[in-house]
Amino acid sequence: ALSSAASDVYKRQGRHSMSQEEINELLLKKANEGKLVVRLKGGDPYVFGRGGEEMLYLKSNGIETEEIPGVTSAIAVPAMAGIPVTHRDVSRSFSVVTGHTKDMDSLYEEIRNSASMNGTCVYLMGLTHLAQITEALVSGGKPKNTPAAVITGGFDDTYRIVKGTLADIELKVREAGITSPAVIVTGEVVNINLK
């Protein structure tokens, strides 16, 4: 029989059980002890999941790794809410953007510059910056009536969705008491209701 000795190394915005460096060291330590190490992440480890950093760290220390991709929450969570990220005649493309980074000013500039894109945009880890994200989109030329949705608890009993527009989504989310983690979706696909 297999036995496991799990270490919970969750990372939520503002709440980290360990720093990334400590996680890297723990992975290396357990691997060097001869353990079969499984680093299980929600979503895809290479979409803002630091999976690449962890694999490079292990490989640079002589540890062989095997990666098994997951399904990113950028696609899975909207799908669970009945929102396809692409849909014929509505959205031919989609982009995934982090909503949280050390250099938020340059991120807002990127968001402003991307406002001319006609496709769907999904923001991960951006709930605390929702007002600034929507403001950057509008100041970049995106119409205020562009549909927007915020989804939390995509796969558990805390699931909730709030829909609105760039003009009112931040207020609606605040009034609904939506908390992180959440996925933000902007674009006409928000009005497609598959549920």
Identify the function of each model-found stretch.
Residues 1-6, 10:
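Single conserved hydrophobic/aromatic residue that forms the stacking wall/gate
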Residues 11-15, 100-101:
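Short beta->alpha junction loops
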Residues 13, 43-46, 155-156:
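Short histidine/acidic/glycine/proline-rich micro-motifs that form metal-
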Residues 14-32:
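Short phosphate-binding loop-to-helix
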Residues 22, 32-37, 93, 101-195:
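A contiguous loop/helix-start segment that scaffolds small-molecule binding in enzyme catalytic cores
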Residues 26-33, 38-39, 50-55:
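Ligand-binding beta-strand-loop-alpha-helix segment within the catalytic cores
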Residues 42-117, 160-164:
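Class I SAM-dependent methyltransferase SAM-binding "motif I" and its flanking Rossmann-like core
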